[in-house]
Design a protein with these regions (language model features):
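N-terminal lobe/hinge region of extracytoplasmic solute-binding protein
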Residues: 34-82, 90, 113, 174
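Ligand-site clamp/hinge motif
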Residues: 196-240, 380, 389-391
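A bilobed periplasmic-binding-protein/Venus flytrap-type ligand-binding module shared by bacterial periplasmic
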Residues: 193-198, 256-286, 293, 302, ...
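A structural "hinge/loop" feature
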Residues: 36-52, 73-76, 101, 149-156, ...
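Surface-exposed binding/hinge segments that line
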Residues: 120-163
């Protein structure tokens, strides 16, 4: 696979950078980055900016280590009650926001109560109320136990009760994160400087400058030395690793790709008037045959140039994954046998047919993403030998949304929160936004999902989450309902200045800014 960058694109990239109002050089004090799309919604944690990624300008109450254990820069103690419906939090003394004003229990209570009322992207789950008992102590009440509430504590950035204004905060945030905003020029750049009041570990970079460039322009700028950190597509990494004066980083990620199948027969519509169901994928034999026919290792090697690992669940590499979920894929003969046994016979056109219905499917994916396009084309080629014809269609998410309930659809997910399993498979989540678009429903699986949520702690929930895949009789995986064909986890790849050390952190998630999860550990290694 080759990537060509024209002289014109490189010139445009360099011209754009030259036009910016700050020096472009990377030093021990300043680091210039192009790691993702512009956060067009601004920087309000109530809205859940940047696809759930690390809150650069804010601090949540908890953070995750590389091994997914929890620690806190802001709390000296945090404990759920035995029944799991109350959390007692104790703040460390003398915490401050980035403007030097005190951060107290009043701010924590305000943040949580306001996030629950605002209807933003932050899923507050069973949250009921937060009360400031005094300056250092907060009591959070839940409507019911929720093992995943620890992830809420680890994602919602704290804002000031006295200075929060929902009309202006997204563009003029005051937080308690590792950096504070200097300036934001929409469409061009975001400049932040180190927060002198940050309660966590400070890295070596006093200033970060984020520029918003497309992949081609960012790659060209990295080669010219004008950017210190650039996120690049995995397919580009094979070329980039041989470039002089840059360092290639490959980061473990839980960002995945998978195909969701419509699980019910056609004939219904949702409240938006979109079709639900597909008579072909409603047959479990079709779903299992596709799962067996796909060679995940081949996809990882040929489409992602090896910068991906095969995945058989949507939570590969996480504690709640079921390690026995893997199976021998790329097995064309087994896939054919499954279809034969289910009555799907080859017709004169070489397409499987059953009761007058041909196995012709349309796979939808979002346009503008070369990786999804290449994956879709490869998937079509891999299922053709078993007699399934797969056409490809792409469009914006608004377009895909109209067809994802009635056609197999290529999705990307990946979170460190096991709540994602609930969103994929709970009948209560069916058709809610992009959750459970296939309208999967299995009462036995639902019981495991609810038991996982009801567990007092996330550790006690793990066996219940694992049972969602397969409990010996039921499950969402290949042994059970084969609700998805999960494909791979995509590793995140970056080019940096040779002097930049990106440190270590928890596995990166789906989202372009997730590299910042490890920002506290970044270093400048040159004198």
């Amino acid at each position: 696979m080759s990537i060509r960058f024209s002289w014109r694109k490189s010139f445009i990239a360099l011209s754009c950078l030259a036009a910016l109002s700050v020096p472009v050089t990377t030093s021990a004090q300043t680091l210039k980055l192009a790691i993702g799309e512009e956060p067009t919604e601004g920087f309000d944690p109530m809205l859940g900016w940047s696809h759930g990624s690390y809150l650069l300008l804010h601090s949540p109450l908890l953070k995750q280590n590389a091994d997914l254990s929890w620690y806190s820069n802001m709390l000296s103690d945090y404990q759920p009650s035995a029944e799991g419906t109350t959390w007692k939090l104790t703040l460390k003394p003398d915490l401050k926001f980035s403007d030097g004003s005190p951060l107290t229990a009043k701010d924590v209570a305000f943040t949580y109560n306001n996030a629950a009322a605002s209807g933003g992207k932050v899923d507050m789950g069973n949250f009921l109320s937060a009360t400031a008992d005094d300056d250092l102590h907060v009591t959070i009440a839940l409507k019911a136990p929720q093992s995943t509430f620890v992830n809420v504590l680890g994602s919602l950035g704290i804002v000031s009760a006295d200075k929060y204004d929902e009309k202006t905060y997204a563009q003029k945030p005051i937080g308690a994160g590792p950096y504070r905003m200097v300036s934001f020029q929409p469409g061009q750049q975001l400049i932040v400087e180190a927060n002198p009041y940050y309660a966590g570990k400070k890295n070596d970079f006093e200033k970060l400058i984020f520029v918003f460039l497309d992949e081609d322009a960012a790659f060209a700028a990295a080669q010219s030395g004008q950017l210190g950190v650039v996120r690049i597509p995995p397919a580009t990494a094979a070329i980039a690793k041989n470039l002089p004066n840059v360092k290639l980083w490959e980061r473990a990620s839980v960002e995945n790709r998978g195909i969701v199948f419509p699980m019910v027969k056609s004939g219904e519509k949702n409240t938006q008037g979109y079709d639900i169901g597909n008579d072909i994928t409603a047959d479990i034999a079709i779903r299992k045959a596709i799962n067996y026919a796909l060679n995940r290792q081949l996809l990882a090697e040929q489409v992602l140039d090896g910068y991906a690992v095969p995945a058989y669940t949507g939570v590969k590499g996480l504690p709640w994954d079921q390690t026995e979920a893997a199976f021998k894929d790329g097995d064309i003969e087994k896939a054919k046998q499954i279809l034969d046994d289910a009555g799907w016979k080859l017709n004169k056109n070489g397409i499987r047919e059953k009761d007058g219905l041909e196995a012709k499917l349309t796979l939808w994916y979002t346009s503008g993403d070369a990786t999804r396009r290449d994956l879709a084309e490869s998937i079509r080629a891999l299922v053709q030998p078993i007699g399934i014809q797969m056409d490809l269609k792409s469009g914006s998410w608004d377009t895909v949304e109209r067809y994802m309930h009635s056609n197999p659809t290529l999705f990307g997910w990946g979170s460190l929160d096991p709540m994602e399993l609930y969103h994929h498979y709970s009948m209560n989540a069916a058709g809610v936004g992009y959750y459970n678009p296939g309208y999967y429903k299995n009462p036995a699986v639902e019981k495991h999902l609810q038991a996982a949520l009801d567990a007092p702690t996330w550790q006690q929930a793990v066996p219940h989450w694992q049972a969602v895949e397969w409990d010996g009789k039921n499950g969402v995986g290949i042994k059970g309902d084969a609700a998805w064909a999960w494909l791979m986890n995509i590793q995140h790849t970056y080019l940096t200045d040779p002097c930049v050390d990106l440190g270590t952190g928890a596995p990166e998630i789906h989202g372009s800014w997730s590299l910042l999860n490890s920002v506290d550990t970044w270093k400048w290694t040159c004198q």
